[in-house]
């Protein structure tokens, strides 16, 4: 089987567009169409449904996608082993949660790009462990970074490379800030027994699937008394804007509100236990030398508190 057809297949599956796949592969769109038809004829199955919105994998196509990626991984490994003395080069795609993409990775990727000029590094938003699993399995990303307490997915290898501090924050003029009579030490963590006194407050949390927001929401809803009012958003910016306007409280990574705390637009009410930063890779997929190098650099940057960026 011509592996070029498999590469076209996986690229079209990832982009969902004949035009985008052709551009990425530096082929004419008609060539992509011909190659996909040739592969479908060879396998005697339909791999894609051609819809006005683009190319969508059929159930059979989705089932064969991971197998095709394994074949291409084996081809890449063969080429690498034939040129073991070659410099580290290639493309690495990092999947990461929103807060890491916005506040940790930009400077880190800039530093990596300076240190590894022959490696092209891309970032892609990944919202949950299940999404990370799908993207790692399909080859859309090579490595994922998530803020999660744990990830129990058998085909994913996980390691803790750092921790992200969390804080409960509010606007300076919020009634609960003004009601605080005992100043808190910066390192003092919340006593979960105190959550009952928060029940009458309004909270803005990140959408379901965010582990620390989910845990906090469960704790709030489990406390006696009136259930709190909880609104969930898919964006840290939306949460922060509502809190800055004095509409309620939020639990967020400290790094995402550091500038607001420094300028006194927000106040820290309680510190919470840190959430681990997990690095994930697919156990059965080949990890290129470029990806291995990027992973090693990310471990070091996280251990240094990201100051290396």
Identify the role of each PLM range:
Residues 269-309:
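A late-sequence structural motif
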Residues 42-43, 64-86, 298:
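Alpha-helical linker/hinge and terminal dimerization helices associated
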Residues 40-57:
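A short LG(V/I)-centered, amphipathic sequence patch enriched
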Residues 153-159, 164, 237-286:
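Beta-alpha-beta core module
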Residues 147, 176-178, 184-223, 287-291, ...:
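Secondary-structure junction motif
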Residues 127-132, 140-141, 147, 209-266:
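Hydrophobic hinge/microswitch elements
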Residues 10-28:
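Short helix-boundary/capping micro-motifs
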Residues 89-152:
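Central regulatory/effector-binding core of bacterial HTH transcription factors
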């Amino acid at each position: 089987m011509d592996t070029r057809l498999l590469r076209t297949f996986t690229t079209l599956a990832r982009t969902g567009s004949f035009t985008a796949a052709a551009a990425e592969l530096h082929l004419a769109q008609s060539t992509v169409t011909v190659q996909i038809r040739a592969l479908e004829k060879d396998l005697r199955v339909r791999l894609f449904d051609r819809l006005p919105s683009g190319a969508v994998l059929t159930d059979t196509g989705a089932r064969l996608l991971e197998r095709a990626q394994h074949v291409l991984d084996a081809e890449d490994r063969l080429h690498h082993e034939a040129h073991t003395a070659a410099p580290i080069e290639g493309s690495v795609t990092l999947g990461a949660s929103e807060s890491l993409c916005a506040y940790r990775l930009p400077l880190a990727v800039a530093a990596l790009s300076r240190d590894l000029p022959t490696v092209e590094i891309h970032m892609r938003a990944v919202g949950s462990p299940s999404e990370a699993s799908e993207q790692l399995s399909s080859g859309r990303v090579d490595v994922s970074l998530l803020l999660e307490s744990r990830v129990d997915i058998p085909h994913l290898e996980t390691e803790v490379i750092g921790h992200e501090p969390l804080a409960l924050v509010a606007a300076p003029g919020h009634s609960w800030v003004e009601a605080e009579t005992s100043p808190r030490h910066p390192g003092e963590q919340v006593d979960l027994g105190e959550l009952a006194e928060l029940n009458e407050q309004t909270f803005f949390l990140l959408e379901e699937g965010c582990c620390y927001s989910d845990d906090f929401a469960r704790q709030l809803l489990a406390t006696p008394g009136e259930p709190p009012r909880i609104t969930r958003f898919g964006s840290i910016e939306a949460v922060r804007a509502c809190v800055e306007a004095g509409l309620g409280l939020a639990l967020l990574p400290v790094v995402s509100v550091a500038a607001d705390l420094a300028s006194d637009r927000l106040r820290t009410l309680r510190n919470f236990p840190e959430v681990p930063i997990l690095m994930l890779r697919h156990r059965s997929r080949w990890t290129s030398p470029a990806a291995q190098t990027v992973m090693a650099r990310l471990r070091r940057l996280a251990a240094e508190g990201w100051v290396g960026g």
